[in-house]
Regions:
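Bacterial Sec-dependent N-terminal signal peptides
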Residues: 1-27, 69
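Preference for long, solvent-exposed alpha-helical segments and helix-linker "stalks"
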Residues: 22-285, 421-427, 441-462
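Residue-level recognition of tetratricopeptide repeat
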Residues: 35, 60-61, 70, 111, 120, 147, 159, 264-265, ...
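Hydrophobic/aromatic packing residues within the alpha-helices of TPR/SEL1-like helical repeat arrays
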Residues: 50, 88-91, 95, 137, ...
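Canonical positions in the second alpha-helix
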Residues: 53, 98, 140, 292-293, ...
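Structural marker of alpha-solenoid helical repeat scaffolds
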Residues: 56, 101, 143, 295-296, ...
Length: 462
């Protein structure tokens, strides 16, 4: 009370400007103190001055929230039981104040990032029900999908809905679950493409022999880390939906929803894609959906699916015509790369190896970081070992070519690096041994493959 009176007197005699300036000066001093401590991870010492600034000048500086998040997390980890309980509540509330006072950064909204961080911490700290967590994730995605990019949080956005669905909650239907999966999956693809665009600039420098700057190397490490995270969580996302998206579930679901959505290009495209990925394309419903999609809105996707239909009917020439139409209808180079890759997969399945490699290489010309295209080519080479070369040594030498190609996949695409290196090692294990090289006297020689491969590989040195 005494302090309150003194403040009122000060207000009366000094005026609001001077009083607020003094308060602000104290806040600035405390801001400096807690920020310096937080920078060196002395979060315990940062707590009290941070709390004062947070209470008295919540709009002073965004550091109140960026460092505040770390300070409270440290308190949750290292504080007393009472401190931990209070800090958990304070941390969740911090995100709401963050949005209130600093919803943007450099003129761009950060609401999606902040809210998704709040939802993730609600999961980590077991604060709130699955429905409450999902509501926060959904608000983040609905209000600001652009800054909602964290792979782990995107995955948990869908997984939370999946958990609600599996709990028997009638508010979440199978149709809603699949729709949300498609949304989140497409978001992952968007983020992967954004990373690929940045990475490809660096790869082109490498390919041209230009030395990478320190900044380029740092960016490459960041891109590789993020690309790997996207790969891991997208794989986990697909694993969850795989449990539900059997043909037995998909076909009756899409049959019941077709009439309502036959003029909805987004729905038709997603339904066709899901049926294709789950190998339900032999069902007549797939034909119905694809033909409706192409009639409604001819696109790269619809033409691609028509190519598949004609391949299944053994109309190879017509299938290829639709595949080419698919490529011509796509203007975005990264989407074009994905379409070319999908066509390469279809051609590989039909045993048309040379054509499949051609399409895979075209895909790489649009997206040099598309590692799975290199893996596809490596597999094409490895599967031709018995068909290329006149001697057993030369036949097995194909595996060196396959291994080299798989290693290219690992070099350009961190999201599949582990699998690509494992594949390369497997191929090398099937190639001629050092004893074979010595016996044949072929160290450093070139082995040329006159089959469809039409290239050569250098025998390793002993």
């Amino acid at each position: 009370m005494k302090k309150y009176v003194h403040l009122m007197l000060a207000f009366a005699f000094l005026g609001t400007g001077q009083l607020f300036a003094q308060d602000n000066q104290e806040c600035l001093q405390n801001l400096s103190i807690f920020a310096e401590n937080a920078k060196v991870k002395n979060y315990a010492a940062a707590y009290e001055p941070w709390l004062k600034v947070k209470s008295e000048c919540p709009s002073l500086n965004v550091a109140i929230y960026s460092y505040g998040e770390r300070i409270l997390k440290d308190r949750i980890k290292n504080g007393t039981d009472a401190d931990k309980t209070a800090a958990k509540t304070d941390l969740i509330a911090l995100y709401d104040d963050w949005i209130k006072y600093f919803p943007t950064k450099q003129g761009k909204s950060k609401v999606g990032d902040i809210l998704s961080s709040k939802a993730q911490n609600m999961i980590d700290l077991k604060m709130g029900s699955a429905q409450e967590v999902y509501a926060v994730f959904d608000k983040a995605y609905t209000e600001d999908p652009k800054s909602f990019t964290n792979p782990k949080r995107l995955y948990n956005y869908f997984k939370t809905l999946y958990d609600i669905y599996k709990s028997g909650d009638s508010t979440v239907s199978m149709s809603m679950l699949f729709d949300k999966y498609e949304e989140v999956s497409e978001k992952f693809e968007t983020e992967a493409t954004n990373l690929a665009k940045r990475l490809d600039k660096i790869l082109k420098k490498e390919e041209s022999g230009e030395a990478l700057s320190t900044k380029d190397l740092k960016r490459r490490r960041i891109y590789d880390t993020n690309s790997n995270a996207i790969g891991v969580f997208l794989k986990n996302l697909d694993a969850i939906i795989a449990k539900e998206s059997s043909c037995d579930n998909l076909i009756p679901l899409y049959q019941s929803n077709f009439e309502e959505n036959k003029n909805n290009a987004v729905w038709l495209n997603r339904a066709a894609g899901r049926m294709k990925s789950k190998e339900c394309a032999d069902d007549p419903l797939f034909v119905t959906i694809v033909e409706a999609l192409h009639a409604l809105e001819p696109s790269a996707d619809s033409a691609y699916y028509l190519g598949i239909l004609n391949d299944k009917r053994s109309n190879s020439a017509e299938a290829l015509r639709y595949y080419e139409e698919s490529i011509s209808l796509e203007n975005d180079p990264y989407k074009k790369a994905k379409t070319l890759y999908k066509i390469a997969l279809e051609l590989k399945a039909k045993g048309r190896k040379s054509k499949a490699r051609s399409y895979a290489n075209k895909a790489l010309s649009y997206q040099p970081s598309l590692g799975k295209a290199y893996l596809l080519i490596a597999n094409l080479y490895a599967s031709s070992a018995n068909d290329c070369g006149d001697t057993q040594f030369d036949k097995r030498a194909v595996y060196w070519l396959a291994a080299n190609t798989a290693r290219k996949a690992a070099r350009v695409d961190a999201s599949i690096k582990k699998a690509a290196l494992k594949t390369a090692k497997s191929y090398e294990g099937r190639a001629p041994s050092k004893t074979d090289i010595f016996t044949e006297g072929k160290e450093g020689a070139s082995v040329t493959f006159s089959c469809w491969i039409g290239t050569s590989v250098k025998v390793p040195s002993l």
